[in-house]
C-alpha cells in the first residue's frame, strides 16, 4: 500500500489513470447548481453531469472523469463524531455515457485500486445486487475472493429514484485491520452491515441500465451509463493509514493551525481513547476545521452567509464553528490564519480560491463579529434558565437552528448548571425540521432520457448572419417528442435543414421567428430550443407541417438588432464590473432579450449610486470609442491564451473550435450569442436597476439604444407626474400649515430632461416619497386622534347611565379603539359599548375597568353571541367581536338596547 501518497497525489493519480483510459477530465464545478432548482448544492460528482445522463445534451466525450467539490449538510450533528462525516468533501468519479459498461467499469476499478494505489486485493470486499450475476463473475475474474463478495437486496444495491434511469450497483470496501475492530467481530462487521471503522466503503459504481416508468415497470435503456463516486478523504485515510479522515494531510494542517491558538491539543491516538473529555476535544477541532473549510469553499463560489436557503446553511455552519472555537477558548487570531491555511492547502487544485481570498476573509470575519452578540445571548439563556431549572424544547431548537449552538454543548452546559432539558420535545421538533429540509434539499435525480431526441442525428445548421433562409423540414415531433411524418393544424416541434432563428441558449432568449409558405406568413414560433444533438427545435401551434416540405424561415430583424445591442452591452458591463469594482466579480447568471439585459453577480456589499454612475460612465466611453466587436473561432488552448472568460456549466469543447467574442482589448468571452459589429451600434446605455437576490447576490438590469432608453425616460416622466399628482390630491385633504416647505419642494420638483439626469432625479424623488410617507403618517395619526377626541366627547356627554351604548356608521376602527381605551381608563365605573356598522358587517368593543359580577364585558359578549350567533370573546374587563347581518339599523339598535337592559 502506498502510504506515502498525499491527498493531492491521490487525486492526480485518479485523474491521470482515467485520462489514460481516454476519459475527458472535467474541471470541478461551482458548489452552486446552475439552472437546476432540484438541488440546493452540488452534492455528488454526477450532479454537474445530469444533462448528459438525461440526454438533454451529448458530452464532448462519452468517457468523463472528475474530482468534484460537494456539500451535504443534512447530518451536520455527525460531523466530528464519526470518522468520515463531512459537510464539504471531494468526490472522485468516472462516468460512461453510452460507452463502456459493467465489465470495463469493474476492470478499471480493480486496476486502479491494486496497481496504482497499491491496495491488497485480499483486503477488498465487494457488495453486488442479489440478481447481478455478471458483476459477480467480473469481480471473480479479476481475482477477488468469492467469499468476499456478498449479494444484497434492492435497498442496499439498487439505485432507483422512482422514475427515470436506474440500475444495480456494486460497492468496494477495504479491510483496515483489527486495530479498528475493538470488539474483534471480524468479517461479521461487513457481512451484517454493522457500522464500523474497519471495513470502509471507498467506491460505489452504479450500472444505469434500466428506465423506471414510474410504476416499477423497468425497460432497458437505449444508452446505458456508468456513474461512480469515490471519496478522496476516505482514500487518503486508508492510504495514509490514519484513524480518521481528519488525521490526513487534507485536514491535519488546518487542525494544527487552530491548535496553535488554544490551550488544547489534538492528539491523533486519542481516537482509541474511551475518555469522553478527550473525545470532546477531538470533535471540537474537527467541527471547526470542517465547517470553516465548507464556508471558505462556498463563499468563494459566491454564497454569502444569510437568512435563507444555502446562505442560511453557511451561516449555521460558520456559527457552529465559532461556538466550538469559543468552547476551546481559541484566540481571535485563529480565524484568519485558519482561513489562509485552508486556501493554501487546497488552492493547488481549486485555483478559484486564491482570487476570492479577500472576499472569503471579509465574509467570515464579518459573520464572526456579528455572531459575538448572538453567542453571548445564548449563554445568557443558560444563566436565566438557572432560576427556572428548565429549558424548553422550543428554546433548545432555537439555540440549535437559529443561533448555531451544537446540541452536545447545550447538554454539557446544562449538566454543569444542573438544568433540565426537554430533549424529547426537541427531538420531535428537530425530526419535523429534518423532514422539511430533506424534502427541500433535492436528490441527484436524472430526468428521463428522451430516446427519440437522443437518436435524432439529422444535421440542422444555424446561420448567424442570415435574416431569412429557404429550407426544408427534416423532422417533426409532437408535443411529447414522438416523431411523426406530419401534423395537421396542431402543435409540435419542427426541425429544418437550416435556420436563421436563434434558439434559447447561454441566457439569450430565442429569436422572434416566422415560417413562410409560398411567400405568405403562416407560423409564428412561440419557442425555439436546442435538442441534445444541437439541432434547433421550433415550436408551433395551430399549424401544419410535413416531412420534406419546402418553406422559408426568417427572424424579426428589429428584434435581433435590439438583442445584439443588449448582449454586447452585457459583456461590456461584465468587464466594467471587474475593472471598476473588483476583479473577483464573476457572472453567476444572465438574461438577454430585446427589451433589456440582466447580469447576476456576487459581491459582499451593495454597490452605491456613485458606483453605478462610475460604471455607466465607463460603459458610455466604451460605446463612444467605437470599438470593433469581433468573432474568433479558436481551439481551447488559444482561447486560454486570449484570457477568454467562460462560466456556467458549458463544457467548452476542448477538441473543437470555440466561439470567442472580443470587444477590442476590453472584453473577451466565450459566447454563442448574437452581437453587434461595433460598440457604436449600441448607441447609449442606462442601468435601470440593481436588485438584491439574497445575501451578497445582485442583479443589474441594463438597456441600450436611443429609442428604448428615450421611451424608458418618457415612461419615468409620466410615472413621476402621476405620483406627484397623487401626493397633491392626498395632501389636499389635510391642513398643511406645518408642512409648507415640503409642499413647495414637491411643487417645484422638476422632471428629468435627459437620461444622464435620470438616476439623480430618481434618487431625489425617492427621498421626496419617503418624506411624503412620513408626513402622511403624521397627518393620519393627527386625524385619527382628532376623531378619537370627538368620539370621546360624544361618550362623555352620555354618562347618565352606567352603560354607554353608542352606534357608529363606517367609523375608523383605530379612532374608535383609541377613544374606547381612553374612556375605559378615565371612567373606570362605566361600561362603554361601541357598535360600528360597515355594509353588512357589525363590529363591537365592550370595556369596563372596574368590572362587577353584574356589570362586565364577558356577560354582555355572551348575550351578543347568543342573540346574533356572533363570534366574540374576551374577559371581564374587555371583549370584542363581530358578525354579519342584513338587519336595518333601527332594528339592530333596539336589539342591542334590549341586551343592555336585560
Curated annotation (Swiss-Prot):
Enzyme's top EC category: ligase
Reaction(s) catalysed (UniProt annotation): tRNA(Ala) + L-alanine + ATP = L-alanyl-tRNA(Ala) + AMP + diphosphate
InterPro entries assigned: aa-tRNA-synth_II/BPL/LPL, Ala-tRNA-lgiase_IIc, Ala-tRNA-ligase_IIc_anticod-bd, Ala-tRNA-synth_IIc_core, Ala-tRNA-synth_IIc_N, Ala-tRNA_ligase, Ala_tRNA_ligase_euk/bac, DHHA1_dom
Main location: cytoplasm
Cofactor(s) in the UniProt record: Zn(2+)
GO cellular component: cytosol
Cofactor note: Binds 1 zinc ion per subunit.
Gene Ontology biological-process annotations: alanyl-tRNA aminoacylation
Binding site for Zn(2+): 567, 571, 671, 675
Subcellular location: Cytoplasm
E.C. code: 6.1.1.7
SUPFAM superfamilies associated with the record: Class II aaRS and biotin synthetases, Putative anticodon-binding domain of alanyl-tRNA synthetase (AlaRS), ThrRS/AlaRS common domain, Translation proteins
Organism domain of life: Bacteria
GO molecular function, one term: tRNA binding
Gene3D superfamilies: 2.40.30.130, 3.10.310.40, Bira Bifunctional Protein, Domain 2, Threonyl-trna Synthetase, Chain A, domain 2
Domains as described in the record: Consists of three domains; the N-terminal catalytic domain, the editing domain and the C-terminal C-Ala domain. The editing domain removes incorrectly charged amino acids, while the C-Ala domain, along with tRNA(Ala), serves as a bridge to cooperatively bring together the editing and aminoacylation centers thus stimulating deacylation of misacylated tRNAs.
NCBIfam families for this protein: alaS (TIGR00344)
Reported function: Catalyzes the attachment of alanine to tRNA(Ala) in a two-step reaction: alanine is first activated by ATP to form Ala-AMP and then transferred to the acceptor end of tRNA(Ala). Also edits incorrectly charged Ser-tRNA(Ala) and Gly-tRNA(Ala) via its editing domain.
Name the record gives this protein: Alanine--tRNA ligase
Amino acid at each position: 500500500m502506498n502510504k506515502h501518497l498525499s491527498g493531492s497525489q491521490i487525486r492526480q493519480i485518479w485523474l491521470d489513470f482515467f485520462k489514460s483510459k481516454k476519459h475527458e477530465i472535467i474541471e470541478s464545478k461551482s458548489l452552486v447548481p446552475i439552472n437546476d432548482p432540484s438541488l440546493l448544492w452540488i452534492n455528488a460528482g454526477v450532479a454537474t453531469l445530469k444533462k448528459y445522463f438525461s440526454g438533454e445534451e451529448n458530452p464532448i466525450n462519452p468517457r468523463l472523469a472528475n474530482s468534484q467539490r460537494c456539500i451535504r449538510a443534512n447530518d451536520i450533528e455527525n460531523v466530528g463524531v464519526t470518522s468520515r462525516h463531512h459537510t464539504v468533501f471531494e468526490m472522485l468519479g468516472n462516468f460512461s455515457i453510452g460507452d463502456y459498461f459493467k465489465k470495463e467499469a469493474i476492470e478499471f476499478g480493480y486496476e486502479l485500486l491494486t496497481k496504482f494505489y497499491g491496495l491488497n486485493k485480499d483486503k477488498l470486499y465487494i457488495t453486488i445486487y442479489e440478481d447481478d450475476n455478471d458483476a459477480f463473475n467480473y469481480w471473480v475474474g479479476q481475482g477477488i475472493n468469492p467469499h468476499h463478495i456478498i449479494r444484497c437486496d434492492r435497498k442496499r444495491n439498487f439505485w432507483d429514484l422512482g422514475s427515470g434511469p436506474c440500475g444495480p450497483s456494486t460497492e468496494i470496501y477495504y479491510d483496515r485491520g483489527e486495530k479498528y475492530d475493538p470488539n474483534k467481530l471480524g468479517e461479521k462487521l461487513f457481512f451484517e452491515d454493522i457500522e464500523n471503522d474497519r471495513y470502509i466503503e471507498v467506491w460505489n459504481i452504479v450500472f444505469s441500465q434500466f428506465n423506471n416508468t414510474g410504476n416499477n415497470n423497468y425497460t432497458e435503456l437505449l444508452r446505458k451509463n456508468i456513474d461512480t463516486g469515490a471519496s478522496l478523504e476516505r482514500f487518503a485515510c486508508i492510504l495514509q493509514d490514519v484513524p480518521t479522515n481528519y488525521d490526513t494531510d487534507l485536514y491535519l494542517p488546518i487542525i494544527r493551525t487552530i491548535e496553535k491558538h488554544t490551550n488544547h491539543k489534538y492528539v491523533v491516538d486519542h481516537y482509541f481513547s474511551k475518555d469522553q473529555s478527550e473525545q470532546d476535544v477531538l470533535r471540537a477541532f474537527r467541527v471547526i476545521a470542517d465547517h470553516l473549510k465548507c464556508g471558505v469553499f462556498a463563499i468563494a463560489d459566491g454564497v454569502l452567509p444569510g437568512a435563507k436557503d444555502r446562505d442560511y446553511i453557511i451561516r449555521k455552519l460558520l456559527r457552529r464553528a465559532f461556538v466550538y472555537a469559543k468552547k476551546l477558548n481559541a484566540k481571535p487570531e485563529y480565524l484568519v490564519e485558519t482561513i489562509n491555511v485552508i486556501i493554501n492547502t487546497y488552492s493547488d487544485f481549486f485555483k478559484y480560491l486564491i482570487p476570492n481570498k479577500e472576499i472569503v476573509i471579509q465574509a467570515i470575519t464579518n459573520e464572526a463579529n456579528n455572531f459575538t452578540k448572538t453567542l453571548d445571548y445564548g449563554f445568557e439563556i443558560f444563566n436565566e434558565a438557572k432560576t427556572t431549572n428548565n429549558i424548553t424544547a422550543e428554546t433548545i431548537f432555537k439555540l440549535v437552528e437559529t443561533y448555531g449552538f451544537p446540541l452536545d454543548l447545550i447538554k454539557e452546559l446544562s449538566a454543569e448548571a444542573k438544568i433540565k432539558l426537554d430533549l424529547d420535545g426537541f427531538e420531535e421538533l428537530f425530526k419535523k425540521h429534518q423532514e422539511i429540509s430533506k424534502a427541500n434539499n433535492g436528490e441527484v435525480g436524472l430526468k428521463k432520457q428522451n430516446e427519440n431526441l437522443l437518436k435524432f442525428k439529422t444535421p440542422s445548421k444555424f446561420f448567424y448572419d442570415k435574416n431569412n433562409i429557404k429550407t426544408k423540414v427534416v423532422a417533426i415531433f409532437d408535443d411529447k417528442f414522438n416523431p411523426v411524418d406530419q401534423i395537421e393544424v396542431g402543435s409540435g416541434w419542427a426541425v429544418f435543414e437550416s435556420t436563421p432563428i436563434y434558439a434559447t441558449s447561454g441566457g439569450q432568449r430565442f429569436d422572434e421567428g416566422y415560417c413562410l409558405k409560398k411567400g405568405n406568413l403562416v407560423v409564428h414560433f412561440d419557442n425555439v430550443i436546442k435538442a441534445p444533438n444541437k439541432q434547433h427545435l421550433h415550436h408551433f401551434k395551430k399549424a401544419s407541417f410535413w416531412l420534406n416540405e419546402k418553406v422559408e424561415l426568417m427572424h424579426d430583424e428589429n428584434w435581433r438588432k435590439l438583442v445584439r445591442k443588449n448582449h454586447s452591452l452585457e459583456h461590456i458591463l461584465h468587464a466594467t464590473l471587474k475593472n471598476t469594482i473588483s476583479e473577483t466579480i464573476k457572472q453567476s447568471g444572465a438574461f438577454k432579450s430585446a427589451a433589456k439585459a440582466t447580469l447576476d453577480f456576487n459581491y459582499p456589499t451593495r454597490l452605491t449610486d456613485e458606483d453605478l454612475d462610475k460604471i455607466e460612465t465607463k460603459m458610455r466611453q466604451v460605446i463612444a470609442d467605437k470599438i470593433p466587436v469581433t468573432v474568433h473561432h479558436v481551439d481551447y488552448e488559444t482561447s486560454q491564451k486570449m484570457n477568454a472568460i467562460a462560466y456556467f456549466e458549458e463544457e467548452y469543447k476542448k477538441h473543437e473550435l470555440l466561439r470567442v467574442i472580443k470587444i477590442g482589448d476590453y472584453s473577451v468571452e466565450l459566447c454563442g450569442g448574437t452581437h453587434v459589429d461595433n460598440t457604436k451600434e449600441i448607441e447609449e446605455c442606462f442601468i435601470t436597476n440593481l436588485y438584491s437576490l439574497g445575501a451578497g447576490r445582485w442583479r443589474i438590469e441594463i438597456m441600450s439604444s436611443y429609442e428604448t432608453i428615450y421611451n424608458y425616460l418618457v415612461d419615468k416622466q409620466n410615472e413621476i407626474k402621476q405620483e406627484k399628482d397623487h401626493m397633491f390630491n392626498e395632501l389636499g385633504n389635510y391642513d398643511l400649515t406645518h408642512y409648507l416647505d415640503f409642499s413647495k419642494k414637491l411643487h417645484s420638483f422638476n422632471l428629468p430632461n435627459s437620461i444622464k439626469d435620470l438616476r439623480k432625479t430618481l434618487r431625489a424623488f425617492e427621498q421626496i416619497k419617503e418624506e411624503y410617507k412620513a408626513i402622511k403618517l403624521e397627518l393620519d395619526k393627527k386625524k385619527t386622534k382628532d376623531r378619537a377626541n370627538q368620539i370621546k366627547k360624544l361618550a362623555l356627554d352620555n354618562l347618565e347611565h352606567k352603560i354607554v351604548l353608542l352606534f357608529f356608521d363606517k367609523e375608523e376602527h383605530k379612532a374608535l379603539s383609541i377613544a374606547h381605551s381612553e374612556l375605559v381608563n378615565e371612567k373606570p365605573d362605566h361600561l362603554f359599548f361601541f357598535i360600528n356598522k360597515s355594509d353588512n358587517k357589525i363590529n363591537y368593543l365592550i370595556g369596563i375597568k372596574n368590572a362587577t359580577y353584574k356589570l362586565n364585558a364577558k356577560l354582555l359578549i355572551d348575550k351578543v353571541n347568543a342573540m346574533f350567533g356572533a363570534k366574540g370573546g374576551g374577559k371581564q374587563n374587555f371583549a370584542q367581536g363581530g358578525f354579519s347581518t342584513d338587519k336595518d339599523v333601527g332594528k339592530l339598535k333596539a336589539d342591542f338596547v334590549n341586551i343592555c337592559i336585560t
